Amino acid sequence: MTSSVELAQTKPLFRVLLLKGFVFYVVAFETEEESSEAELPLVYLHDFELNINKRGKIEASYVDFMSCMTRLKPSSVSYTRVSSEKSSEDFSLPGSGKTFGSKVLNRKVTFTFENGVQLVFGMYGLEQRCVSSDYLWFENVFVGAHCGTLTYCLNCELDKSGGELEILTFSKNEVLLKRW
């Protein structure tokens, strides 16, 4: 994986893996209290750890999402899911969002910190292969659905892209595009 990106005035807050607009994937979190080399494991938007094996394929294993969030220490977390057929809805109630007519889903998670900084994660996919019935909560807030076939989807996209995966580095004031 590429080394941490050094910025002149502010450190990156997080990095995500971008596969041709198909899915956003959290690659690393960095906080200003930690050194630029300190990274969390590769963390899926909800609860996965990603690794690239020697054959260049993506493998996944479960990680403790709650402990990752404990390190991030957001003051609040909100989750919204939008379909192309419906307006934005807040899925903060148990059982919400389990039926969707649209094939295309846009899912957004917003982390708000005490200093007012907001980190917004988006995810895009096909309902029939990228959403299951396993839902994740953080401090009584619904923050996502586990995707049982995500590694399959990512490897398909990796094959299509010729092995080029883009890394987006977000900071408070700017967005930098890097390649893996």
Swiss-Prot record:
Interacts with Hsp70h. It is found in: Virion. One of its GO terms (cellular component) is virion component. Keywords: Transport, Virion. It comes from Beet yellows virus (isolate Ukraine) (BYV). Involved in systemic transport. Necessary for long-distance transport of the virus through the phloem. The keyword Transport applies. This is 20 kDa protein. It comes from the Viruses.
